[in-house]
Amino acid sequence: MKAIISLLLISAMVFSMIEAVPLEEGLQLFEGERGCLPHNRFCNALSGPRCCSGLTCKELNIWASKCL
């Protein structure tokens, strides 16, 4: 019984630590992982003519100079 209670308490502590990271910070980390540059919303140079759209990089056509 003590083991179950201890496991529940540890699980609750781990969950509260995960939730402590602000959403914006988490999105910035995810944005960096996918190669987007946050100041101009373009992907890094190695990915070619692509820009950030939501959570992914998409092809940048000749008519678009910046991702919306």
Swiss-Prot record:
<feature type="propeptide">
    <location>
        <begin position="21"/>
        <end position="34"/>
    </location>
</feature>
<comment type="similarity">
    <text>Belongs to the neurotoxin 01 (U2-agtx) family.</text>
</comment>
<comment type="function">
    <text>Insect active toxin causing rapid but reversible paralysis in crickets. No activity shown in mammals. Does not show effect on mammalian voltage-gated calcium channels.</text>
</comment>
<protein>
    <recommendedName>
        <fullName>U2-agatoxin-Ao1u</fullName>
    </recommendedName>
</protein>
<keyword id="KW-1015">Disulfide bond</keyword>
<dbReference type="Pfam" id="PF05980">
    <property type="entry name" value="Toxin_7"/>
</dbReference>
<feature type="disulfide bond">
    <location>
        <begin position="36"/>
        <end position="52"/>
    </location>
</feature>
<dbReference type="GO" id="GO:0005576">
    <property type="term" value="C:extracellular region"/>
</dbReference>
<keyword id="KW-0528">Neurotoxin</keyword>
<feature type="signal peptide">
    <location>
        <begin position="1"/>
        <end position="20"/>
    </location>
</feature>
<feature type="disulfide bond">
    <location>
        <begin position="51"/>
        <end position="67"/>
    </location>
</feature>
<keyword id="KW-0732">Signal</keyword>
<feature type="disulfide bond">
    <location>
        <begin position="43"/>
        <end position="57"/>
    </location>
</feature>
<dbReference type="GO" id="GO:0090729">
    <property type="term" value="F:toxin activity"/>
</dbReference>
<keyword id="KW-0964">Secreted</keyword>
<keyword id="KW-0800">Toxin</keyword>
<keyword id="KW-0960">Knottin</keyword>
